[in-house]
UniProtKB/Swiss-Prot annotation:
Family according to the record: Belongs to the class-II aminoacyl-tRNA synthetase family.
Enzymatic reactions: tRNA(Lys) + L-lysine + ATP = L-lysyl-tRNA(Lys) + AMP + diphosphate
Keywords in alphabetical order: Aminoacyl-tRNA synthetase, ATP-binding, Cytoplasm, Ligase, Magnesium, Metal-binding, Nucleotide-binding, Protein biosynthesis
Name of the gene: lysS
SUPFAM superfamilies: Class II aaRS and biotin synthetases, Nucleic acid-binding proteins
Cellular location(s): Cytoplasm
One GO term (biological process): lysyl-tRNA aminoacylation
Binding site for Mg(2+) 2: E416
InterPro entries: Aa-tRNA-synt_II, aa-tRNA-synth_II, aa-tRNA-synth_II/BPL/LPL, Lys-tRNA-ligase_II, Lys-tRNA-ligase_II_N, Lys-tRNA-synth_II_C, NA-bd_OB-fold, NA-bd_OB_tRNA
Name the record gives this protein: Lysine--tRNA ligase
Cofactor binding annotation: Binds 3 Mg(2+) ions per subunit.
Cofactor: Mg(2+)
Any one GO MF annotation of this record: magnesium ion binding
Major enzyme class: ligase
Lineage of origin: Bacteria, Bacillati, Bacillota, Bacilli, Lactobacillales
Amino acid sequence: MTTEHIEELNDQQIIRREKMAALAEQGIDPFGKRFERTANSAQLKEKYNDKDKEELNELNETAIIAGRLMTKRGKGKVGFAHIQDREGQIQIYVRKDAVGEENYEIFKKADLGDFLGIEGEIMRTDMGELSIKATHLTHLSKALRPLPEKFHGLTDVETIYRKRYLDLISNRESFERFVTRSKIISEIRRYLDGQGFLEVETPVLHNEAGGAAARPFITHHNAQNIDMVLRIATELHLKRLIVGGMERVYEIGRIFRNEGMDATHNPEFTSIEVYQAYADFQDIMDLTEGIIQHAAVSVNGDGPVNYQGTEIKINEPFKRVHMVDAIKEITGVDFWQDMSFEEAAALAQEKKVPLEKHFTEVGHVINAFFEEFVEETLIQPTFVYGHPVAVSPLAKKNPEDPRFTDRFELFIMTKEYANAFTELNDPIDQLSRFEAQAKAKELGDDEATGIDYDFVEALEYGMPPTGGLGIGIDRLVMLLTDVTTIRDVLLFPTMK
């Protein structure tokens, strides 16, 4: 360690380093070694919470725990402290005459943030708090920096996101939210595995962006001397696996989109995509409802979800409505009628709906109407289906009205949570859709994709009728944990 670095340290950091050196002089490794526990805080509370002081004295049972020192009080020959492990906190009671003078010195000199191992007897204090009366302490790791805001947790938002480890130490609600996130993902896996789906892994580096309308991150492969993109979706590779005969596949993984950031968008996020052979979008609606409800039950039980004061009836059948019907109900505009792009654009001008310069089809106008007037009204879980072909380059046309596709999106609290459709498996139609996307890209649509000829070739070998689905995991976790910003469900959100 350089002299320059030491001079930059504050008083607390200097004192902690001196204590570290003192431990080493006593033959104690300041950063410890393997330590075997017999229980954690939650297990002890579950086992002994119904026992009073006298019962615990009669039982005379012991335990070995370990964790971070979060509070410490007392003076002279007696002290109390709280030790925090993954499951929570438990109090320890330390007496000099019980642990010995040398062992008690370890406790006295321990700083908040240090890790300790404690062996002792299970007891209840006169105040009624379940505790461990220490018979031996082991120093496990020295914290060289003090913890933030000792009693009130971490409150600075910038620090919470940049230094998530400090947030997890000091904010139990935040810690539990990320435990819940893991449980949600595990339950989704369990549900799909139970339905006969196979979890697979596909490449993160792609030669061509595809499977979604989004701007990609571009990188370079030095050995091959080619530009590549980070995936904006897993769709096209997963559908290749359907061609290969896997029939039911899903992937949970990171997606990368070089776009703006807001309360519900992060450039790097987690999605799940699911593909089922011999199914259509109606089957996938049922599957989506099952996934969402199963995840909700694992967190909130079999009932509605409360999100920001609104009761979301996630436990009831989801509403289903065609996009055109939803627009007509709110605006009175009937897009079931045949009309030219110019006529549709005139309706948009009349209703003050902004149109992008690359819009060339009636379907673009229909989608713009939906985004302008309908999305903000969708509070309860609602499947909106029948998207126009112009905005659904990978979805199969509806056989009864080829202007529209067998596609749906799930909306809850005005936000999209899932996107799905009967997959386009006609390679000729697929190529023409790719060509239309390439043209839109030339006209200035940054989110339009190029032509994936290899995927078209795969379809030429034959893909069975297939239903596909994508769900944003982060938004789902936000809903089920009642938070309003995606940064609160990402352990390490993107920061400047």
